Amino acid sequence: MLLIAGTLRIPAENIDAVRAAAQAMIAETRKEDGCITYAFAQDLLDPGLIHISETWRDGAALKAHGESAHMAAWRAAAGGLGLGERDLKLYRAVEGQPI
């Protein structure tokens, strides 16, 4: 299992446009084979900061996600929205358990 966690910086004035562009991509991503979780969340104290959390079954599923049409559409739309610093980390997990 692969976990991705991190942040994406967005100009606060573009948050509505980013939200609109991201919604279709997120909805399609959640339907992908191998996608366990996929979420963007706006920071409550810093409106220009988006927290990203992803869980994938394996590397093949993550690779297919990166090559998908909806990710290409997201990258094209996001290019004009002033997306700033991206800080994402990939983690490998053996198993998870409720806490």
Indicate residue ranges for each PLM-predicted region.
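Glycine-rich beta-strand-turn "strand-cap" elements at beta-sheet edges
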Residues: L2, F40-D46, A76-I99
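N-terminal first-folded block
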Residues: L2-I36, F40
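Short, well-ordered beta-strand segments in beta-rich or mixed alpha/beta enzyme
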Residues: L2-R9, A39-G66
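Short loop segments at secondary-structure junctions
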Residues: A12-E13, R57, V94
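An amphipathic, aromatic/His-enriched active-site/gating alpha helix that lines ligand/cofactor pockets
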Residues: A20, A24-I36, T55-K89
